[in-house]
Amino acid sequence: MKANILRTRFKSILLILGILALGFVASPRPGSATVSADGFQLGPEVVISAIDNEKYLPAVAYNSNHDEYLVVWQNKWPGNRDIYAQRISSRGELLSWFAVAPGPGGNPYDRAQPSVAYDPVNDRYLVVFIHDVFGDGSDWDIGGRFIPWNGPDSGLIEFPICTWNSSQWNPVVTYALAQQEFLVAWTNTPSGQPAYVSAARLNRDTGAVLDDFTISAGPENRINPDVAYNLARNEYLVVWDRVGGSHDIYGLRLTGSGVALSGGEFAIAGWPDNEEQPTVAACHNADQYLVAWQSLVGPPTNYDVYARYVSGDGVPGTVFLVDGTTAPEDTIDATCLQDGRQYLLTWQTMYAGGYYGIWGRLVYPVGMEASFGLVQPGAAADRTAPAAAGGQVNYLAAWVHDRDGTAYQDIHGRLIYLHQLYLPMVVR
């Protein structure tokens, strides 16, 4: 049972409107899904990778041409780290898995912190990551590799994205459909100076850097960037965590060509509590962003998760509590359906036994539904670090899944289907 506190759950008449508006959509296999009291369906839990090692930091992208997902993650082996991937159909079938990096053209040292985006024009993914330049941890750069939709091509080698002398961390990538290029953002940590956030526009065909520039710098550290692309305007919103007297969340809108829009950076969450580790998604049908974060309401470790709408023209709107109990809720992730009409938030929450499970919440541009459990913790094992992507009629959420009774960490996931309307079949 979840931590013992009465939880406020929001219900919305949009639940009914959503069923009527969505009409008929594809269903999972009969008997393969759990139907919630709120009408959505959870597909069966899927073991994405169970190789005997430790896995971290899953990231997910949706392939609109082939109606499938790609999950990437970081492996930790004795003595090294690398990046693997698994293709998964929109019905939850495992299609193929493969190594991403180190790949052709790269050094043999560690790769970590992957992020992935899909290019429907070239029908391939860009996976970005940090890599250990000298193998001693003294300099970490940003690299990338294009992966065709059905698996790696040895002719598509790793390429550099940022090779500055300062170390780079936590890269995130998105694809701009109208601009037909990628945007990558990351944190720089120059020696003896505050950390700051940078970005680069990448050519979709070659990976060449078209332009790189500073997103935000100043006397305080800027860390933990995330980025979303808004097709309605051909614009981006980059968000980050600014560390001053407390942690606050800021954002900056960019044109498709990377030019900062009027007004510059703006505050999204700046209250006395620490607001940390932002995530952002764009729903282009509503011309809107959803920014979420964890807020330290009970130091030192009791976080709640909050979210705020930001309009397409950069006006912060309603703030709402996503989940809050006397136990920590943190590490939140946001995504949106491909057609831009509904968000999904996923996060980890501590249960009464002290171990984490994964929860989620469907959010519309004007309201949200009740939160729901995706997976409970094991008897003595965590489920953490959720990530998700939205497809045409469902989402895929993935997480780090401690293997019960071992030191291994696997990657698991499950599909979340939209509200569906079933009519009885009449046989005459």
Region locations from a protein language model:
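Bacterial N-terminal signal peptides that target proteins for export
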Residues: K2-L14
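Bacterial N-terminal signal peptides
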Residues: I13-V25
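Cleavable N-terminal signal peptides
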Residues: L20, P30-G31
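Extracellular, repeat-based ectodomains that mediate carbohydrate processing or recognition
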Residues: G31-Y422
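Gly/Pro-rich, tryptophan- and cysteine-flecked surface segments typical
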Residues: P424-V426
